[in-house]
């Protein structure tokens, strides 16, 4: 007896590629046939409606009605055949898709037995990193928003202080610093007036010496 051939990795890859290619190819072929049948059925429906209108028309002769009735029966029979064909194609598409999926699963199982690390499992660590990175972005946005609000408040306070200074100038006509300067100059004048080196103090000293 001949020993059964062992499947190598290349044969498994070929079977896997064949199954992956067969699923969309068979489905597109079957759906195309169904669309053609639906287009033919639309023509049948329109002809059947026109035949029914002829039958309901009172002016139609008896011979014309008999002819329309025969044509209508033929249309209905063809409609029945096409409808059955459409349902058969749909059932065949379901069966062939199921068989292709089974082939695909069989290839996957063989691949996993031969190459345990062939299919990389889904790891949720990436999702965890995304979840941890989102709050960091949110905290940065909040910090930027707080800094921007603080800058806006500081600018508003500076603007209000400048407005108060302008209001003082318009009310008094001069700044408070000028008033302080005038007060200091008056004090200086009083000091000079009562200083021993002033002209009045020297005149008093001379009159005292003469006496």
UniProtKB/Swiss-Prot annotation:
Alphabetical GO biological process terms: transcription initiation-coupled chromatin remodeling
InterPro entries: ING_N_histone-binding
Chain intervals with Low complexity compositional bias: 195-211
Top-rank taxon: Eukaryota
Pfam family, one: ING
Spans through the membrane: none
Record region (Disordered): 155-211
Compositionally biased tracts (Acidic residues): 178-188
Protein name: Uncharacterized protein C16E8.12c
This protein's GO CC annotations: chromatin; nucleus
């Amino acid at each position: 007896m001949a020993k059964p051939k062992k499947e190598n990795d290349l044969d498994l890859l070929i079977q896997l590629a064949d199954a992956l290619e067969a699923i969309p190819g068979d489905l597109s072929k079957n759906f195309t046939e169904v669309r053609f049948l639906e287009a033919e059925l639309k023509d049948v429906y329109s002809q059947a409606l026109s035949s029914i209108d002829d039958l309901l028309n009172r002016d139609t002769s008896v011979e014309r009605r008999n002819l329309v009735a025969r044509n209508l029966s033929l249309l209905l029979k063809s409609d029945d055949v096409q409808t059955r064909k459409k349902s058969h194609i749909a059932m065949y598409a379901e069966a062939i898709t199921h068989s292709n999926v089974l082939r695909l699963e069989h290839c996957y199982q063989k691949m996993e037995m031969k190459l345990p690390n062939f299919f990389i499992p889904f790891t949720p660590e990436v999702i965890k990193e995304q979840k941890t990175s989102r709050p960091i972005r949110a905290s940065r946005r909040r910090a930027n928003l707080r800094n921007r609000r603080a800058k806006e408040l500081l600018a508003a306070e500076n603007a209000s202080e400048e407005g108060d200074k302008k209001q003082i100038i318009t009310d008094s006509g001069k700044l408070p610093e000028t008033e302080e300067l005038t007060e200091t100059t008056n004090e200086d004048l009083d000091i000079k007036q009562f200083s021993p080196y002033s002209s009045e103090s020297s005149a008093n000293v001379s009159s005292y010496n003469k006496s």
